[in-house]
Regions:
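N-terminal secretory signal peptides that target proteins for export/translocation
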Residues: 1-6
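Bacterial N-terminal signal peptides
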Residues: 9-19
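Boundary at the C-terminal end of the N-terminal hydrophobic targeting segment
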Residues: 22-26
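Beta-propeller blade-edge and WD-like acidic-aromatic loop motif
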Residues: 27-49, 78-98, 117, 121-144, ...
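Conserved beta-propeller blade repeats
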Residues: 58-77, 96, 103-121, 132, ...
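Generic beta-strand/beta-sheet core signal
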Residues: 216, 229, 264, 277, ...
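Cap/lid segment of the alpha/beta-hydrolase catalytic domain
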Residues: 378-380, 385-519, 531, 552-563
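Active-site-proximal cap/loop segments of hydrolase catalytic domains
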Residues: 414, 467-660
Length: 660
């Protein structure tokens, strides 16, 4: 086993002796990965660093996709080359047989009923213009089902495998409508529902008899509705949600008797609860998890309809429960490793449950839980995949602890507290700190396995703290909305409060703090650099927003209405003025720390222009800035070869500007 080293002392010394002025960095450009990765101002990566980090970058993970048609194996997603592909596993711990060999990473995968054929979504170069491909694992042949000039997602098979419902922008290039195709006649796909402006439709489940389609409509994080579409007469009826009293409702599946459906809802203004509701008109939900105060994040029902399995998110940690759908009794599955659980899926024989599990010390892998005779009882746990960890001894990896720090405002006359996960290296410190802020913003940092975080802790000797600042999901609806619109910079003030807290911790070094974030987290990096340059050493901005107005004007049409709800409508003069005022690009003179900016050329969410304009403005002012752009990536780096170089460059950046 290879044990992580605490630092690269010789490499740090070499960097300290290498004169690199800001002007030289600005004009030093080189490429790698067949010219697809462009680096400006970034030093060449030393070979010893590449070798040192290889162990972390060789870490793999696996995710469950589907049981095979005969039920004796499963399809998983994992990576052996540069991109994630479909593999088949026949037995617990068995070999992973690669089934697909596409150049691009696979997206969503659903198996055709009664067959091993797979419907797979895939884009090109990270542009998110997904196409739907029908792949036959037996012959290894594939054919395009979508029209190749629109965005197509959420494929869903009918019970007999003859029809495929899906979401597509093919009507006008921007509206996410609901479509239906006969798989043998994909060119004659039918438009089922036109999505009203500012919303999208997506298929969720077919009823067992094939008559009804459960449809999800999404307006924003606070308003999502569920519809029942009768495929006989094409009539549509809202069954959950409301235009007058909006709530978040996520459809999961029909029951197995064609009498009702399951969904996750916060309609009672509290945690997201699991509910069942009849499909008959004018019925009300029956809440199944009223005794649990945490959000339900996942649910699955067995093919015979007798068992259910749901997952809760308890301040970032997952708990798995089994449900007797007849008595409505449930029990928690104990003796599971503490971590994150996702994607529960029952075996066709109804006697096993597959799910993904990640802990702070083990990558995401697939586990199968045998089920007891009593419906809500569990049996033995089997691990089906054992993902490689690059030869590292993961028992040495830092385990995060949950902390809460006070921020600037008050609740019931007491300071509001912000939850955060803290990873610390060995030793008394004081340790340098990297603040890791999540994107979204309607997201949450959860302590899943992260080779990158462990790399920073072990190889740089830094502490890593990941706060769930206001606007994060997983807590309550009030907390989720606390950064909307004109409240945007309150989230930045939560970062300032974290800097105050760091200063009070004897094991943390307040004079050596850097910040890292992607997407909305990239905006927070830039905004923190505006407000707290005197308290930060450096920042890493990955596909971040630099100007809210240009971002909203240039993001893809199908995304714009949803982002306006979160950030504000730039067409409104008052809001436009506010967004201009708080945008980091318009406050670039206040940024006085070195930055590493990372971008994908094909990003449809945060266009590359957002990174290009902040880099240009910083260079104009003589600020140290490293810039990395991948020509074959989008919103983040999916290709391992690109991700490797960017992570290596980030280590160099932190060594030069945080540790020295």
């Amino acid at each position: 086993m290879i044990r992580p080293h605490m630092s690269f002392k010789l490499l740090i010394l070499a960097l300290a002796l290498t004169p690199l002025c800001a002007a030289a960095e600005s004009h030093n450009e080189w490429t790698t990965n067949d010219g697809q990765l462009i680096l400006q101002g970034v030093p060449k990566i030393p070979s010893d660093l590449v070798g040192r980090l290889k162990h972390y970058q060789d870490v793999r993970a696996a995710r469950f996709l589907a049981w095979t048609d005969n039920g004796r194996g499963m399809y998983i997603r994992t990576r052996f080359g540069d991109t994630s592909q479909v593999h088949k596993v026949q037995t617990p711990g068995g070999a992973r047989q690669q089934m697909t060999w596409f150049r691009e990473p696979i997206g969503q995968v659903v198996r055709r009923p009664g067959s091993d054929e797979l419907a797979i979504t895939m884009d090109r170069g990270g542009g998110e213009q997904d196409q739907i491909i029908l792949f036959d694992p037996v012959s290894a042949r594939s054919r395009m089902l979508s029209n190749n000039d629109s965005r197509n997602r959420k494929p869903l098979w009918s019970p007999d495998g003859s029809l495929l419902a899906f979401q597509s922008t093919r009507r006008n290039g921007r509206s996410n409508d609901l479509w239906l195709m006969k798989v043998n006649e994909p060119e004659n796909a039918e438009l089922l529902l036109e999505a009203p402006a500012g919303s999208w439709y997506g298929p969720v489940d077919f009823s067992r008899n094939g008559r009804y389609l459960l449809v999800q409509q999404f307006w924003n994080v606070d308003d999502s509705r569920i519809y029942l579409l009768d495929l006989n007469d094409r009539s549509l009826r809202m069954v959950a949600g409301s235009t007058e009293n909006p709530s978040a409702n996520r459809a999961v599946s029909f029951d197995r008797r064609n009498g009702g459906f399951y969904y996750i809802t916060n309609t009672r203004g509290r945690a997201a609860e699991l509910a069942w509701q009849s499909i008959e008109p004018d019925t009300v939900p029956q809440f199944l998890t009223a005794g649990i105060r945490w959000d339900v994040s996942d649910f699955a029902v067995s093919d015979d309809g007798k068992r259910g399995a749901f997952v809760t998110n308890e301040e970032g940690i997952s708990r798995l429960y089994l449900l007797n759908t007849k008595t409505r009794r449930y029990s928690r599955v104990r003796k599971l490793p503490v971590g994150l659980i996702s994607g529960p899926r029952f075996h066709p024989d109804n006697d096993r449950l597959a799910f993904n599990l990640s802990t702070s010390q083990t990558p995401n892998d697939v586990f199968v839980l045998k089920l007891g005779r009593r419906t809500e009882r569990a049996g033995a746990l089997q691990r089906w995949t054992y993902s490689e960890v690059g030869g590292l001894d993961t028992s040495d990896f830092a385990k995060p602890r949950l902390v809460h720090y006070p921020t600037f405002d008050f609740v019931d006359e007491r300071p509001r507290t912000v939850p955060a996960f803290l990873y610390e290296p060995e030793g008394d410190g004081p340790h340098p700190v990297i603040i890791r802020v999540h994107g979204g913003p309607e997201s949450q940092y959860r302590p899943a396995f992260s080779a990158r975080t462990q790399m920073w802790v072990a190889e740089l000797g830094v502490a890593v703290i990941a706060p769930n600042i206001r606007g994060s999901s997983g807590y309550d609806t009030d907390y989720l909305a606390m950064d909307n619109g004109y409240l945007r910079e309150d989230a930045v003030r939560d970062i300032g409060a974290l800097l105050d807290w760091i200063a009070d911790q004897p094991k943390l070094d307040e004079n050596r703090v850097a910040i890292y974030g992607a997407s909305y987290g990239g905006y927070l990096v830039l905004a923190s650099a505006v407000h707290y340059s005197d308290r930060l050493r450096a920042g890493v901005d990955v596909v971040g927003i630099s100007n809210f107005v240009t971002f909203l004007e240039n993001t893809e049409d199908y995304r714009r209405p949803f982002r306006r709800f979160e950030y504000g409508d730039e067409r409104d003069p008052e809001m436009r003025s506010f967004l201009e005022r708080i945008s980091p690009l318009n406050n670039v003179d206040r940024i006085d720390i070195p930055l590493l900016v990372v971008q994908g050329r094909n990003d449809p969410r945060v266009p590359a222009s957002e990174s290009e304009q902040i880099v240009a403005a910083l260079r104009e002012r003589g600020r140290p800035v490293w810039y990395i752009e991948a020509l074959n990536e989008g919103h983040g780096y999916d290709r391992q070869e690109n991700r490797n170089v960017y992570e290596q460059a980030a280590i160099l950046f932190f060594q030069k500007y945080l540790l020295n």
